[in-house]
Structure formats: structure tokens, C-alpha cells
Design a protein with these regions (language model features):
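Non-catalytic C-terminal accessory domains or segments of carbohydrate-active enzymes
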Residues: 11-129
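Short coil-to-beta strand junction motifs in C2/discoidin
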Residues: 2-6
Length: 129
């Protein structure tokens, strides 16, 4: 599928963050019935080092893009992401940790146009910088 990771985390925009699926070679993506008037949009996120997944901006069809996110790092204990945007813009960044916990953090972009967030495993929110 073009990802270096063989395990992906899938979510639907309709199902929100409470309906995450793990997808791999042995577990196919489960889809519900949809129609042209009510399509099911699926967002896939690769599993990163340490078992984390950057789910990105939860209310966007393209939740992670190189235009927004400039770096992502992860280990078993924590994950971080650097991103950019307009001065004063509030960006919501969501991660799923190795244990399946989901964290959501709102960070305000500063005058430099850059910001970052770090989340530790088990935390419901991260720390902005």
C-alpha cells in the first residue's frame, strides 16, 4: 500500500476516533455500507516506531500532510510531531499510543509559524511547544 509499516490504523470520518481498526496482512479493513450521497471516508495511518500512530487532525479529510507536519518521532514511551501553520491558528493533533489509548492536544501556532507536541504513553493530552 506504499507504507513502510505493515500495520496501519484505520478510522472513518463518520465513526470518529472511537472506531479505530488495526489493519495488517492478517486483518483486512472492515467497511460498512455507504452510498454516493453518504460515502464512507477511511483514513489510514502507518504504525510508527514503538507502536504509535499519528492520526493527525481529526476533522480533516487529509489528516496528515507534508504541508502541515514537518517531522514525527516516536519510541515506546512517547511520540512527538512538529507542524506549521498561520500565526495564532489552533491545531488539534491526535496520536494513538502503543496500548490503544488516544490522545488529543490543541496547540496554538506562534509567530514563527511553527509548533510541536509531545505525548507520553497513556496520557490523554500532550504538551505543546
Amino acid at each position: 500500500m506504499g507504507y513502510s509499516s505493515s500495520t496501519l490504523v484505520a478510522r472513518t470520518l463518520r465513526g470518529g476516533l472511537g472506531a479505530l481498526q488495526t489493519v495488517d496482512d492478517n486483518t483486512p479493513l472492515a467497511l460498512s455500507t455507504s452510498s454516493p450521497d453518504d460515502p464512507e471516508v477511511v483514513v489510514l495511518s502507518p504504525t510508527l516506531d514503538g507502536g504509535w500512530a499519528l492520526l493527525g487532525e481529526p476533522n480533516k479529510w487529509v489528516s496528515v500532510s507534508p504541508q502541515r507536519f514537518t517531522a514525527v518521532q516516536s519510541s515506546a514511551a512517547s511520540a512527538s510531531a512538529s507542524f506549521r501553520g498561520a500565526d495564532g491558528e489552533v491545531v488539534t493533533v491526535v496520536f494513538r499510543d502503543p496500548h490503544g489509548h488516544v490522545s488529543s492536544t490543541q496547540c496554538k501556532i506562534g509567530t514563527s509559524g511553527n509548533a510541536s507536541v509531545k505525548v507520553t504513553a497513556g496520557a490523554s493530552t500532550g504538551v505543546c511547544a
